[in-house]
Design a protein with these regions (language model features):
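Metal-dependent phosphoester/phosphodiester hydrolase catalytic core
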Residues: 1-469
């Protein structure tokens, strides 16, 4: 499908989708079946509805923001396949081990006829998150050192990146990008491209600089810049950066004004629940030695234990992206767009936050700037974890972790945000509608009939105008 110049641009987005049958007990919520209950599939419900609606209302893009597959949490069907070919008593057990097993994950994720129709009809863009490879992928230098010492890891990471390039990344590239891509012509001309992809994947894992997974897409007067927040991390000694300097410079070059809207997508939310944001700032400082060597060891254990690995845990990169958002919204990089929106997933709850700027930028006129998080498509948290996530948005928790961050020497951020919608913890799908310089966000919740038996549908959760133009 090509763009209609006289129609609004519609982008559907979400993240974190496990593959499971569309029948009980898998369609039940975790409260009804903690092990198997995944609730209604928002992406599947969206595709079912599309089949019965006017094509003029269909999205122009489906943006999938990570955890399209779960390499470390396989289904019963995939586990049966794994058992048929190797000893699961040896690591990595029932997690995927090689390229062949990755192909099973992708087949299971997208093999349903309804989803095959969706993916054949609507243009897609994707980016990985940790579970596409392994839980907490590239959290820290200590994590990488530990995993590379495992005898099965080299095959896992090589197969994971090779299959990601084939099943996800290749579709992100424009015709011009394909012409410039060093891997595509080798794959196209190789016949059997196994060796080509394995060599590329091994290099992409070992040599961060030189492999760019970030990309940009233009949709008329709207620019989308998708930022890799997993594979390109710099974790060398005292350096902790979300992406290396060359790739960040590329992001800065692409993220400009002179568009009606600038969309920046990153699988990991940039603006977290405030309490978690300050906790990650504190943890990064402590793990780097702010409270001494003994506490640095504790800080690393805490970091890996509760997944403190978002943008706030890479403070230099967080500040650099804040400066970029402010520069675009403030009109310092061309005419300010109608809106700047950061789209994210990962955290298994959905919310909308509006940015404001501090210091020398406070009070200046800016385009509206937002963080829109939509997660999960189908993988809800257990009820006890849902409560913890809600508390992280409340003032008492924020006050405690902000105090800890200041005690560890972390300076106040130049960017602030206020949560206007959420958090909500059901299975969701988000849709952006961009009409000229106007922008509207709609989030819908997936539901099934009582008992989880029957076709899922989508119900409105909230609508929020992001820009009046």
């Amino acid at each position: 499908r090509t763009l209609h110049g006289d129609h609004p641009l519609r982008i559907a987005f979400g993240s974190c989708r496990v593959a499971a049958p569309h029948e009980p007990p898998w369609t039940l919520p975790p409260s009804a079946d903690r092990k198997r209950g995944k609730g209604a599939d928002a992406l599947y419900a969206f595709a079912l509805r599309m089949r019965d609606t006017d094509p003029d209302t269909w999205p122009d893009l489906l943006l999938l923001l990570g955890d399209q597959i779960y390499a470390d949490d396989t289904s019963e069907k995939v586990q049966a396949f794994i058992r048929s070919r190797r000893d699961v008593g040896r690591p990595p057990g029932l997690e995927v081990a090689d390229f062949e097993e990755y192909t099973r994950l992708y087949w299971e994720a997208w093999g349903d006829p309804v989803l095959r129709w969706l993916l054949s009809t609507v243009p897609t863009a994707m980016i990985f998150d940790d579970h596409d490879i392994s839980d907490d992928w590239n959290t820290s230098a200590a994590w990488v050192e530990h995993m590379r010492a495992q005898p099965w890891w080299e095959e896992r990471i090589t197969s994971g990146l090779a299959s990601y390039w084939l099943y996800q990344h290749l579709g992100n590239l424009s015709p011009d990008d394909l012409d410039d891509d060093p891997v595509w012509p080798k794959v196209r001309d190789a016949g059997d491209a196994t060796r080509v992809l394995r060599e590329f994947a091994a290099q992409a894992d070992q040599e961060i600089e030189g492999t760019r997974w970030s990309y940009k897409r233009d949709f008329g007067r709207t620019r989308l810049v998708v930022i890799d927040s997993r594979c390109g991390r710099v974790l060398e000694g005292s350096r902790r950066e979300m992406i290396d300097d060359d790739e960040f410079a590329w992001v800065e070059e692409q993220a400009t004004g002179d568009f009606d809207h600038l969309l920046m997508a990153t699988s990991l939310p940039y603006a977290l629940a405030p309490a978690i944001h300050h906790l990650e700032e504190w943890n990064e400082a402590v793990a780097a030695g702010a409270w001494g060597r003994a506490m640095a060891w504790v800080g690393e254990k805490v970091r890996q234990g509760i997944d403190l690995e978002h943008w706030a845990a890479f403070n230099d990169s967080f500040d650099r992206l804040a400066a970029l958002i402010e520069a675009v919204a403030g009109g310092h990089r061309g005419r300010p767009p109608g809106s700047v929106v950061v789209l994210s997933g990962d955290v298994h709850h959905t919310y909308l936050a509006e940015f404001s700027f501090r210091g020398e930028h406070a009070g200046h006129g800016h385009s509206p700037a937002w963080q829109a998080v939509c997660s999960p498509l189908r993988n809800p948290l257990p009820r006890d974890q849902q409560a913890a996530h809600r508390r992280a948005f409340r003032r008492p928790a924020r006050a405690v972790t902000r105090w800890l961050a200041r005690r560890a020497g972390v300076e106040p951020d130049e960017i602030a945000w206020r949560v206007g919608e959420g958090p909500r913890v059901e299975n969701h799908l988000g849709q952006l509608e961009l009409d000229g310089r106007r922008a509207m966000l709609k989030v819908e919740q997936a539901v099934t009939p009582d008992g989880g038996d029957g076709a899922p549908s989508l119900e409105p959760l909230y609508e929020h105008r992001l820009s009046d133009g």
